[in-house]
Amino acid sequence: MTQQLNVDPAEIKKFEDMASRWWDLEGEFKPLHQINPLRLNYVLENANGLFGKKVLDVGCGGGILAESMAKQGADVIGLDMGKEPLTVARLHALETGTKLEYVQSTAEQHAEENPETYDVVTCMEMLEHVPDPLSVIRSCAKMVKPGGHVFFSTLNRNIKSYLFAIVGAEQLLKLVPKGTHDHNKFIRPSELLKMLDQTALQERGITGLHYNPLTDTYSLGKNVDVNYIVHTTL
């Protein structure tokens, strides 16, 4: 009996259709380019650097975070189920001379083949796009080495996140395409922590990611009402 993949075909198609514009700094993925230095620095600071470490980026898309981690001297594999985003990621790595590998697979499949393999696992802006986020979290826990670091980022589910991420970002400011997110799939920090409790991962810190529409800039802070990042260790 074939195991059902933890994949939403509609989500895959959504990002396949936008793949060619992944590295357009003024396109649909501009917010990802803007927040990437913050995400990268958060990982660097909490994982004590990445140089020489084996790193997996789950749900890597077109490779924005994966490529930036490779440039820090990490041995990076980017994992995604979208064929077109991975094609774009590979081409961009060739253009920039960045050495890393991209694999088309689910977290679950990769975990079966690569247990306790990585020093650092990142899973950013991905959990809200799969049918079973707990399954992805369990897979990340399985793939990291004992003592290793796993980072998750997603969106909180409340009225404020609906107003900011759906009404504001998608409908008014048009920071991302309409339909990019489904508010019902957003994950409260308390829910994410309960999922972590079902694994061996230990939460080490949580921080919010904030957008200032007046300055068109992002920053990290204590408020986790909308976007947030969680640092865990095994």
Curated annotation (Swiss-Prot):
InterPro entries assigned to the protein according to its UniProt record, in alphabetical order: SAM-dependent_MTases_sf, UbiG_MeTrfase
Pathway per the UniProt entry: Cofactor biosynthesis; ubiquinone biosynthesis
Swiss-Prot/TrEMBL GO biological process terms: methylation
Keywords: Methyltransferase, S-adenosyl-L-methionine, Transferase, Ubiquinone biosynthesis
Residues that coordinate or bind S-adenosyl-L-methionine: 39, 59, 80, 124
A Pfam family matched in the record: Methyltransf_23
GO molecular function: 2-polyprenyl-6-hydroxyphenol methylase activity; 3-demethylubiquinol 3-O-methyltransferase activity; polyprenyldihydroxybenzoate methyltransferase activity
Broadest EC class assigned to this enzyme: transferase
Entry's family note: Belongs to the methyltransferase superfamily. UbiG/COQ3 family.
NCBIfam families membership: UbiG (TIGR01983)
Function summary: O-methyltransferase that catalyzes the 2 O-methylation steps in the ubiquinone biosynthetic pathway.
Full protein name: Ubiquinone biosynthesis O-methyltransferase
